[in-house]
Amino acid sequence: MAFLRCEIASESLRMATAVDVILPDQGELSRIKTLYLLHGLTDDCTGWTRYTAVERYARERGIAVVLPEVQRSFYTDMVYGLSYFTYVSEELPAVCRRMFGLGAARKQNYIFGLSMGGYGAMKCALTYPDRYAGAASFSGVSDLRCTIAHRSLSLQETEITAIFGEKKAVPPKDDLFVLAERLSGDAPGIYLSCGEQDGLYAANERFSAHLASLGIAHRFEHWPGAHSWDFWDASLRAALAYFFD
């Protein structure tokens, strides 16, 4: 495997930004599967490689892994800030295909994330279901509207304003429940997990029930666990097995 730490000039962000990439050293890159792996609110693009065995898991399956950096943006095109959703969902895949020759076919592309990144992964997959074969959310912020209303995140008021504007309201385009209702065509495969001692467990139960009520096939797995890297490493293994084995 090759591990690349890159700084790319992003047009949508109007600045240089970090992205880590794990590439197999065998096989034609245009034919392999690519996993976009998203970080959480208090991490950066190095978290997954520092605290899990993602490179080993990628080697075992011969897949590429792309780990972008989005700061504390909640994977949104911020009202007062940068266009991180556009970057992750549109610009970054195009850059990876141009620079590394990764495949563009839906069947080759997957997106996973933890916590804030779990929200981001679901948002990308539900907004653009034709681009991803599968998506996974681990301890995801699935009910963002409720979470923001109850100030259940370690976001400052100024950060919430920067992301969503003065009203601090989550618009429909950023609400996973609404995006699921608007889903048309074939849904990507969906995998959800959450620890039973996690403060986000009830929200993930609600989201799973909502998907079920809409007839959207998915798997929701839960077991004793907290909002922790131990749980996310286990979830990553489970999701990789679900989609790739």
Regions found by a protein language model. Name each.
Residues M1-D245:
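Non-catalytic cap/lid and distal C-terminal segments of serine-dependent acyl enzymes
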